Amino acid sequence: MKKTLLAEFTAREGARDEVARLIGDYARAVREEEGNLVFDVYTRASAPRAFWIFEVYRDEDAFQAHLKAPYGGPFNVALAPLIEEDASVLTFLDPLSVRA
């Protein structure tokens, strides 16, 4: 079963450009992971400092491999002082089966 999540955080005032640079570099690395299917980065139209990252991994093993990637820790350390939250807020999603 695919592992899908939404990661959210808000850049501190004056840090948006640095956060955008960091997440751009990180996105390029994550998209190269064998088990990553989607890593799309968005900002909220009405609040451009609010970042939303929609992530999909092939399965739980692929997600665990993502968590162990060597660039994840340094990314989170660099990101932490630039965002309002203590860390990214993660929301795990399950697909809804809808019959046509």
Model feature map: region roles:
Residues 16-18, 50, 62, 99:
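Intrinsically disordered, low-complexity acidic/polar segments
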Residues 41-49, 76-100:
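Glycine-rich beta-strand-turn "strand-cap" elements at beta-sheet edges
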Residues 14, 46-48, 70, 74:
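Short alpha-helical
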Residues 3-33, 37-41:
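N-terminal first-folded block
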Residues 1, 18, 89-92:
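Terminal low-complexity, poorly structured segments
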Residues 3-10, 40-67:
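Short, well-ordered beta-strand segments in beta-rich or mixed alpha/beta enzyme
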